[in-house]
């Protein structure tokens, strides 16, 4: 039976955050009382055909993904003014804030815990033929049970086996193939995984430039110019260096990464 949603079925609470195309509000479904995050996208802000296509694609992809480390989309509806996305409520909120409150970085055990959860989600997404293309702390949430949740599928695409040329992502996380406007595939998420691991451990991204100078950042990316301090273990260093590889085909695959010593030391081998 198809569930039909309308806004009057929800009691709207406090503002949780603002995104590129709208706001996210805490909400309670009146009949059953369950708590959700309601993303409200004003239709007037969808000003191009490409934006409309991107939002439709985001809804299609996100609503079909069901994994403990991916924020659930329970449904969606619209009226004359807005599009509404009914999302899982992540009780501990924005992962970026959680990271900032911890001084901007984690120790190796905690880093490996959260990176493993990202990898489990990416493994599932690969099975579903999905590339996220914008993995970064700002697109992660944290559930009440400390489960990391990948959110914001605005740049996600189907057909991970096809090679694409759309330029997307965040400057500090851009893979070499994106910087050089080359075709790209699911290898882009492996690069982002390496950047994320580095940032969790170091409190900054590896290819940062002064005043966010794009040309300087791109030069560093293409030359793999970054440093790892000696205080970082050889396992962690090796894990990062095997993901931050210029050629996408030479990056460590997720199955190998899940069983890398950096992960196994703290969490055991994975059968995923």
Swiss-Prot record:
One GO term describing the cellular component? cytoplasm
> Could you identify this protein by its name?
Aurora kinase
**Which lineage ranks, top first, belong to the organism behind this chain?**
Eukaryota, Fungi, Fungi incertae sedis, Microsporidia, Unikaryonidae
Assigned protein family: Belongs to the protein kinase superfamily. Ser/Thr protein kinase family. Aurora subfamily.
* InterPro entries xref list: Aur-like, Kinase-like_dom_sf, Prot_kinase_dom, Protein_kinase_ATP_BS, Ser/Thr_kinase_AS
Molecular function, one GO term: ATP binding
What residues does the Protein kinase domain cover?
10-263
* PROSITE patterns the UniProt entry points to: PROTEIN_KINASE_ATP, PROTEIN_KINASE_DOM, PROTEIN_KINASE_ST
Keywords for this protein: ATP-binding, Cell cycle, Centromere, Chromosome, Chromosome partition, Cytoplasm, Cytoskeleton, Kinase, Kinetochore, Nucleotide-binding, Nucleus, Serine/threonine-protein kinase, Transferase
What subcellular locations does the record give? Nucleus; Cytoplasm, Cytoskeleton, Spindle; Chromosome, Centromere, Kinetochore
What EC number(s) would the UniProt record show? 2.7.11.1
Active site per the UniProt annotation: 134
- Reactions accelerated catalytically: L-seryl-[protein] + ATP = O-phospho-L-seryl-[protein] + ADP + H(+); L-threonyl-[protein] + ATP = O-phospho-L-threonyl-[protein] + ADP + H(+)
Give the domain of life.
Eukaryota
Specify which residues bind ATP according to the UniProt entry for this protein. Answer: 16-24, 39
Enzyme class (EC, first level): transferase
> Tell me, what does this protein do in biology?
Component of the chromosomal passenger complex (CPC), a complex that acts as a key regulator of chromosome segregation and cytokinesis. Has a role in error-correction of aberrent kinetochore-microtubule attachments to ensure that sister kinetochores become bioriented and connect to opposite poles by promoting spindle assembly checkpoint signaling.
Q: Kindly list the biological process annotations in GO that this record carries.
A: chromosome segregation
Where are the annotated coiled coils located? none
Please verify whether the record's keywords include Transmembrane helix.
no
